Amino acid sequence: MNSTLTSKMTVQDALVDNGLLGKGTRSLLMAVAITYAISWINWFFTSWQSSRAVAAAKRAGPGQLKRPPTLPSAVPVVGHIFQFLLGGHAFMSRAAKHYGLGVPVRINLATFPSYIVSGRDCVAAFLKDQGRQLSRIPRGLNYMEHAFGCPHEFVHQFKPRDDVDIEHQMHTALQTMLAGNGLEVLAGRYQTEVAHAALSTSLMGKEHEWTELPDLCSFVEDHVLEAATRALYGPHLVALNPTLARDFWTFNRRVKSMFMGVPKWLNPSAVRARDKMTDNVKRWQLYAAEHCNIDEIPDDVEWEPFYGSRYTRVRQKLLTKRDIMNESARAAENLAFIWATNANSVPSAIWFLLETLHDPSLEKQVRARLQAARTESTDENPLNFDVNKLTSDSLLQSMFAEILRLRVAALVVRQPTDAKGFSLPGGWHIKPKETLSMSTRTELMDPGVWNAGDAANPHPLDSFWAERFLVYPDDPRSGPLREPKRRFGAATNSEPYFSLDGCTWSWVPFGGGRQLCPGRHFAKCEILLTSAIFLSAFEIELLTDKLPGPDEGVYGFGTMPPNGKVPCRIRRRKIVSV
């Protein structure tokens, strides 16, 4: 032992004598000191800039425009990007509150500087955009190329033009066809497809036989993705691509990296997943074109088997009208729509199911509401629901609103197009081509807005409360808002009712104003019908006492899915005809 110790001391002495250990230590200390100095200087400089902006804003007189302050940063060049990547919601919420909600603040996410919009008044002005001074940023074209696979040489065809603005035309078509009779037909088709998928599944045994599943979420998302695709695109897209559901969810897990512009050579698995999906879509496009003349289908046909819904046909015709004929470019646009219609509604439906099953008392109430909405069984679908009853039920609506409040985390990004820029309440001025970002989650989790219960009966905003959006006429503390904006005494009975009164610019999972999501009504039908069918078709017992949290890795892109598996045991229920 002594010889070993002597040997170690000899080696150490030799290193010191030769100056090696001291030189390494000095180099390390020098690197730490330089890094610290650079960080401190950058923090000091950005704080000084910010203080000047705040002081100038305070000196501004009535009618004078003010420039927003910058959030201080210790890291030069890349700014706040690491804070954003480590926790998007926490960072955006902290940044929005740095000078107080309602004061726009500049952040720097590497090559993407942006001004955060927060607070009800500023969010209202931002979403209303009454002067039509804001537009989606040009990055949307990059998304078509990198996230959805449009060949670079055809991306320009999706650029807005005065004569044929394809995005506006598709938005208008979607608004028209996902309302009234169009919505009714599509919702009916959707529930038939979901019921068929649920009742014909081969993953479990006969009635009354329990089957253990490693993950309820995967079971639901695969069946619902295929059903939704059949409803919107007809049966052939699924039939031609047996692995479509798994291909889509693999793509969905990787799409964020492509949205953020990670180079192909650093992101091969994501590119492969995207290309697999575009190949699937192209296979359907070619099959449909070969077997059906789209121009011969009457305009008033709401659904047919080759193209599915009327809206899908209209979109294909608009692509042709815009002279977008390349199959890969068309596949990219179709993939973008498939992603938009499933990436948010399916995880929301799963959360609705999980929260219901996690609370036996709530499950009992929900099952009673679902039974009341059952309609006469048919040969085509033995499990029918009155969609209007589902979507107008007070408890189910409250649960729907709460799921979206708690789980949606989208970033709404716009740029001023007017030469004068864009002004927010308070006189804050944003110059042309500067970027504005609004985090829906910051507004949906604002403790100054939402009712979180009281000391005797707390309901924290980061936990699910099924009745948060229910108003009890005889209880002034009920309802979604911390400070209710309603009058009492006018109710004719004591029954609770669903309310979004006063929530217009705070409950913003679908955006708002002229950019309000046109598919919101169908999304509501999807979420409630999915939950109704799975709860009615199966008896499900969760094999975990604690639900997973939301996957904040997808922050900024819509609904955050569960961040873990949910094991369960499941068996078929006997379907009793109504």
UniProtKB/Swiss-Prot annotation:
Pathway: Secondary metabolite biosynthesis; terpenoid biosynthesis. The chain crosses the membrane at residues 28-48. Pfam families: p450. Keywords: Heme, Iron, Membrane, Metal-binding, Monooxygenase, Oxidoreductase, Transmembrane, Transmembrane helix. It is a single-pass membrane protein. It is found in: Membrane. Heme binds at residue 517. Cytochrome P450 monooxygenase; part of the gene cluster that mediates the biosynthesis of the enfumafungin-type antibiotic, fuscoatroside. Within the pathway, fsoE catalyzes the oxidative cleavage of the c19-C20 bond within the E-ring, resulting in the formation of a carboxyl group and a methyl group. FsoE exhibits preferential substrate selectivity toward glycoside substrates over their aglycones. Belongs to the cytochrome P450 family. This is Cytochrome P450 monooxygenase fsoE. The gene is fsoE.
